[in-house]
Amino acid sequence: MQGKIFILPKDSTNQQFVELSHPLTGRPLRYLLTNDHLLQILQVGDSSKQRSWFVGDHVVSDGYLYVCTPIDLLALVLPIIQELTWSRRKEPNRYVSFEDFIEHFDNMGPHYPRVSEVLSPNLLNTLHRICKVNEPVGSLPKTFQLDESSVVKILLRKAKVAQENLPPSIVTELKKQLAPLDLRTPLPQDLLELSCKWHAASLVCEDLQPEWYNKLAYWQEELAPLHAYTKNLEESRKILVEKEALLNSKKRPQNSDITSSLLKKPNRKQATKKSKYFSGEGMTKISSFFTKK
C-alpha cells in the first residue's frame, strides 16, 4: 500500500502541504500547514535498512516516520523584515506597515499567499516580537522596524533552553571530543558546559544568516578557554599519533629486508643471463638417437 506515516501535534486540522524556500539556503522545502501552525517535516528512520509498517490489514511500504513539529515563524519573517527596513549597511533606516510586509511575503512564491492567509495573526505577532513599533496616528497605519536587540534576546533565550535540553547522545559526543589523553585526568566540567552552550547556539541559529550567530558573539571571550583547550588537545593527539607511528616502525625486525630479498625469485632476465654460461661439452647430441642403423 502506498502512503506515509505522519505524526502531528494534537488537534491539528486542515492540513495541507506547502512549498517554501529555506530562509538560509533558498532551497525549496515542503512544510505542512495546519489551521494554526506551520509544521516542519522531519524524516526519521535508518536509510541502510528497508522497513515497512503494518496499518490495519495493510502494509505501508515506506518504513520512515514523518514527524511534524511547529516552527517559529521568526526564521521566515526575519530576512524579509530586515530587507524591508534595513539599509544595505545593515542599519535600520525605515518603517513599513503590515500590509507592505504581507505584499512582499506573498511575492516570495506561489504557496506564500496561502500561508499568510491562514497564519496572518501569527505573522503579525512575530513582527511585534522582533520589531520596534510605531502606533497608528490618524490615517497612518501601525508600522514596524526590525530591532536587533529584540532578536538577540530571543535567540539567547532559545539557546539557553536548547542548552538545558540537549539530547544525551550529543552531550556524550561532546564529552568524547573533550576527553583528556590521560584517562586519570577528569574532564573539566566548566569546559563541557561552554561546549554545550556553543553547540546550543549553533543549533538555534542554523536556519539564520551567519551574522545573527555572530551577534551573539559577546560571549566569544567567554569561549576563549574552550578554544585554547581544544587546540592544545588536538596538537597533543597529533603528537601522540606520530610517536605511535615511530614506535611501530622501530619494532619492525632489522633483518626483515634481508629475509625478504632471499625469498625473492630470480626474474627472467637473471635466468637468461645465467644460461649464457651453460656449456654442453661432452654431451651427446639428441639428434644422434634418431640416426638410421
Swiss-Prot record:
Residues 251-278 are annotated as: Disordered. Its main location: nucleus. The keyword Nucleus applies. Keywords: Cytoplasm, Nucleus. Pfam families: RNase_H2-Ydr279, Ydr279_N. GO terms for cellular component: cytosol; nucleoplasm; nucleus; ribonuclease H2 complex. The keyword Transmembrane helix does not apply. One of its GO terms (biological process) is RNA catabolic process. Residues 265-276 have a biased composition (Basic residues). It is found in: Nucleus; Cytoplasm. Component of the RNase H2 complex. Non catalytic subunit of RNase H2, an endonuclease that specifically degrades the RNA of RNA:DNA hybrids. Participates in DNA replication, possibly by mediating the removal of lagging-strand Okazaki fragment RNA primers during DNA replication. Mediates the excision of single ribonucleotides from DNA:RNA duplexes. Belongs to the RNase H2 subunit B family. This is Ribonuclease H2 subunit B. It comes from Schizosaccharomyces pombe (strain 972 / ATCC 24843) (Fission yeast). The lineage of its organism: Eukaryota, Fungi, Dikarya, Ascomycota, Taphrinomycotina.
